Amino acid sequence: MSEATPAIAVDGLYKRFGIVEAVAGIDFTVAAGSTTALLGGNGAGKTTTLSILLGLLVPTAGQVRVFGEDMVRHRHRVLPGMNFSSPYVDLPRRLTVIENLTVYGHLYGLSDVSDRIRHLARDLDIEAFLRRPTGDLSSGQRTRVALAKALLNEPRLLLLDEPTASLDPDTADWVRGYLESYQRESGATLLLASHNMGEVERLCDQVLMMRRGAIVDRGKPADLIDRYGRETLEQVFLDIARSGDGAGGAPNTDTGATP
């Protein structure tokens, strides 16, 4: 992969479930080493897009390339460099935290599972409950464990679905700070699905505004705010949600996010 090859390149992507068009012909790129958000309300197509990127769903039409590899044809070559974190994906609740992480470490083919768990336990402040059943943890603790699971294989691409959903403000702020530091220090590429405007403004180089399966506008958070003449990304989001279109009635096609 050359330095110019994007981490993600999506071209003409469609996904239909019967007569429902969940993803409606979207195109976007994500630069390697950047952080991008899929921003939209419920039913916008964010999670479906992530599921296609993870190889969990096959697109109806279109192409998805991850690090230059076709995701549909060569997912076995792509997946080892990726991982996924979501508060909605439950780890086996009867297993202890360390048992869960050990199982996943072996599934990822790691040779140094114990060392990697110790490192992440320290970084994510989960050492105190490594030997507790995962089902006994608070939502904030489970979110940290889910992140540890997702980072075990040191992914080049980390996909996150609503990473701070249902967290109290203090824990949510800690998670955002950790993701910010992790991306900066590791150089990994992050793609997150969210409808938390403050989170997106803080973390992201590029925002893809989604509505009813389509990308209706895109750009850096500050550029979107300026383009719509607003003070916050939340106000931009509400403008788009109420109008059903992007600024000036047409999407901005500039896809260049810089790290």
Locate predicted features:
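Conserved ABC ATPase "signature" region
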Residues: 102, 106-129
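Conserved ABC ATPase signature
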Residues: 133-137
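Conserved catalytic motifs of ABC-family nucleotide-binding domains
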Residues: 154
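Catalytic Walker B motif of ABC-type/P-loop ATPase nucleotide-binding domains
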Residues: 158-162
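Helical segment within the ABC ATPase nucleotide-binding domain
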Residues: 173-185
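ABC ATPase "signature
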Residues: 218-219
